[in-house]
Amino acid sequence: MGQKVHPHGLRVGVIKGWDAKWYANKKDFADNLVEDNQIRKFVKKELFSAGISKIEIERAAKRVKLNIYTAKPGVVIGKGGSGIESLKKKLTNYISGKNILINIVEVKSVEAEAQLMAENIAAQLEKRISFRRAMKQTMQRAMRHGIKGVKTACSGRLGGAEIARTEHYHEGTIPLQTLRADIDYGFAEANTTYGKIGVKVWVYKGEVLPTKKVEKEEANA
């Protein structure tokens, strides 16, 4: 059976960057990695209603900077920045003895962000909305935002069936093997009365061409 590699991991260093931007020696590497994982889990849980699509972590000597990509920056920031101050205090349980900086980045096209799309489908499944309807409506909204293609998959006891299965739907093109293709990927889980249902979303936003090649072509023209 053909297995799918993670679209982001496959393109790291080619057209995509790292979500963890830091360097550590062998002694500290494992601790930093565990700390990163705990931070991401906590922030996603604490700010779930804000629609977090991505969290980037940058580290310096005694400083940790979080770039939080969110659909609702007002929910994260709070009244007069109270939300950020509260988040910083809670993060001291995971980050000790370091200065914490939080940068909020607004996600413009929420309907075409793979992680937010997956979470939206999962939320609808938990409200007992038909999985086919949830998937198709989410895909149609995304296609209106000018993306090249979208694919969704739901796995589990769909509709309360005795036997678990996977159903896929797609619109447009999704070139998963093309490294220059900008593929956004999101995963979420829906906790239903019949058990967990996994939701995966792939969004194709177009090709990313190497800048050097484009510059050469422009010079030759």
From Swiss-Prot:
CC per GO annotation: cytosolic small ribosomal subunit
Q: Which Pfam families match?
A: KH_2 (PF07650), Ribosomal_S3_C (PF00189)
- Output one GO MF annotation: mRNA binding
Which PROSITE patterns does this chain map to?
KH_TYPE_2 (PS50823), RIBOSOMAL_S3 (PS00548)
Q: Which UniProt keywords apply?
A: Ribonucleoprotein, Ribosomal protein, RNA-binding, rRNA-binding
Q: How does it assemble?
A: Part of the 30S ribosomal subunit. Forms a tight complex with proteins S10 and S14.
The protein's job, in short, is: Binds the lower part of the 30S subunit head. Binds mRNA in the 70S ribosome, positioning it for translation.
Query: Known HAMAP family for this protein?
Result: Ribosomal_uS3_B
- Family assignment? Belongs to the universal ribosomal protein uS3 family.
Under what name is this protein listed? Small ribosomal subunit protein uS3
Origin organism is Clostridium botulinum (strain Alaska E43 / Type E3)
